[in-house]
Amino acid sequence: MKKKAVSILMTAAMAASMLATTAMAGETEASTEAFDPGTGKVYLLNFKPETDEALQTLASDYSSQYGVDVTVLTAADGQYNTTLTSEMAKSDAPTIFTVGNATAAQTWNDYTYDLKDTPLYSHLTDKSLTVNYDGKVAAIANCFESYGIIYNKTILNDYFQMDNAKAKSMDDINSFDTLKAVADDIQSRVDEINDKFGTSLTEAFASAGLDDSSSWRFSGHLANLPLYYEFKDDGVDLTAGEPTIKGTYLDNFKNVWDMYVSDSAADPKTLNSGSYNAEQEFGMGEAVFYQNGDWEFSALTNEDNGYEVKAEDLGMMPIYFGVDDANEGLCSGTENFWAINAKAPQEDIDSSLAFLNWVITSDEGRKAMVDDMGLTCPFDTFTGDYASKNAFGAEATALQSAGKTSVAWSFNATPNVDDWRKDVVNALTDYTSNGGSWDAVKTAFVDGWAHQWTLAHEGEASTEAATEAATEAE
């Protein structure tokens, strides 16, 4: 089939400009125009499990206030594409769904409503935060995120005071080699640190779980680093990628992964058991380092969770990869783009657009997005009391201001993302838990990419046909 031009218009540097634009618009108020919720139904298929509770509450409040039926279904980790395909085949299909990358924009082209002339688009502070395909704005980002290695400032500052510490301040931890030296040393001195400072430390790094609830941190977010640096070398679009990869930086991936595993109290043989909770380990002060993103800020600082860490304890550093550590910033981007189902009845389209506009303009919606979900939102309505309170997002901006280069979310290019990641996780599990060969990880990463790319980019017509057939058969 003839390929159409696809672009996810996003650059790593836009985080700073987006946040700066929002800050300068401090006096911007939410729209005061008369609100019309419409007469249709809203069905949001949510991509982010960690936002489910807040979205369910919003849906209930909106339904009570406006009499509009709002349903929120949250897909399980790693199952979004499967769930989306299944739900889209039903007569009551989602009216709002997530388009995460170029492949998704192509696959669901017939289902994406052009958002260019909507209030949602008009409120977007950075018009590059869209997925554009086939001459239309197919989807709009609902948040902008950064991830790296979360660290406990208080415990690290205690460690820096110890004799023979491998670093004396955070400024010293500016490369993979130094990070590994510090992590190795902390892991070997856990009891000494606890005795000296009264901490409850058990490990340097929180567990690197390979079950579905955690493995995406490594098959997606850690895997982003070798993809990013290879795409950069090859001079291709950093978020659109290329049909084949060489795995140039997989040895760097291995070095970081081995550090995560060896400098943790978790048993490597049981990492896929689902028995570990890395957030809890870090939140209770049992770990110094935890690879995750700014979406964790809300959970870690929520008093209801009973964690010992406080907001002032938290910092985030880049995932130093041993390639360009001196210039590397956090990994910044998004894969969370709202799309509207163009095949839904017009009244449902109108009500779905009204609901999203309410989320980004109402007090209830903005509070939920910022306070309950901990998101940094790219709309001009998120100012004043609704400006992001996420300290991790501020770290991303500070690093950019210091001249560091944010790492683009190159994993947005991943073809058939769930299938590719599953194969990588299986190989990574065999290597880590069963003494398998690292070559199998390379094969899953490199050969698996080419295979899934072929399926994704040449099989779009069959995917769409299958969905249409399922719909007609219902």
Model-found features: residue ranges?
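Extracytoplasmic/periplasmic solute-binding protein
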Residues: K136-N142, Y147, D177-G241, A287
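Extracytoplasmic "Venus flytrap"/periplasmic binding protein-like
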Residues: D61-D126, T130-N132, K136-A139, T154-K168, ...
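Short helix-initiation/N-cap motifs at beta->coil->alpha
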Residues: T74-T83, N174-T178, T270-M284
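C-terminal capping/gating helix-and-loop segments adjacent to ligand/active sites or protein-protein/ligand interfaces
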Residues: S332, D372-L375, T381, A396-Q452
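Conserved N-terminal structural module of periplasmic/extracytoplasmic solute-binding proteins
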Residues: S7, A20-A104, L120, E347, ...
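Glycine-centered hinge/linker elements that transmit conformational signals in sensory
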Residues: A183-D184, D233-N272
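Extracytoplasmic/periplasmic substrate-recognition and gating elements
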Residues: K90, N305-G374
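Hinge/lid segment of periplasmic solute-binding proteins
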Residues: E29-A34, V99-N157, D195-S200, D313-Y320, ...
